[in-house]
């Protein structure tokens, strides 16, 4: 019975940490860049887009493909950085959880 109570307390603490981690994910911003910083995309670690910056020198109506490619590259860079931030935040949140050997969190 004592083990069950300890497990319940551990589960409650984990739930609180996960709630806090979700808030941190929503607040953490990452910036992806392309074209030597001429295009920047800012996302939250949850993947929500915050802003896009495009240098005016890239706004050529005759060559929209260049801007399109740079936007995709900057977005991909921001997503990669967001995924890294997400892993770090979630790893911190799960830090106190004692899982059986070989078992991992589902993220």
Swiss-Prot record:
UniProtKB keywords: Cytoplasm, DNA-binding
Pfam families reported for this sequence: YbaB_DNA_bd (PF02575)
Primary localization: cytoplasm
Localization: Cytoplasm, Nucleoid
GO molecular function, one term: DNA binding
Domain of life of the organism encoding this protein: Bacteria
GO cellular component, one term: bacterial nucleoid
Secretion signal, residue range per the UniProt entry: none
InterPro entries assigned: YbaB-like_sf, YbaB/EbfC
Similarity-based family: Belongs to the YbaB/EbfC family.
Subunit structure as annotated in this protein's UniProt entry: Homodimer.
Cited function: Binds to DNA and alters its conformation. May be involved in regulation of gene expression, nucleoid organization and DNA protection.
HAMAP family with a match to the protein in the record: DNA_YbaB_EbfC
Record's protein name: Nucleoid-associated protein Mmar10_0436
């Amino acid at each position: 019975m004592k083990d069950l109570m300890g497990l319940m307390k551990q589960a409650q603490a984990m739930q609180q940490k996960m709630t806090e981690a979700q808030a941190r994910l929503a607040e953490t911003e990452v910036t992806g860049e392309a074209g030597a910083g001429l295009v920047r995309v800012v996302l939250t670690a949850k993947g929500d887009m915050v802003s896009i910056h495009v240098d005016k020198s890239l706004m050529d109506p005759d060559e929209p493909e260049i801007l399109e490619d740079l936007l995709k590259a900057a977005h991909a860079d921001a997503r990669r950085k967001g995924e890294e931030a997400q892993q770090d935040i979630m790893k911190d949140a799960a830090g106190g959880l004692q899982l059986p050997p070989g078992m991992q969190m589902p993220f």
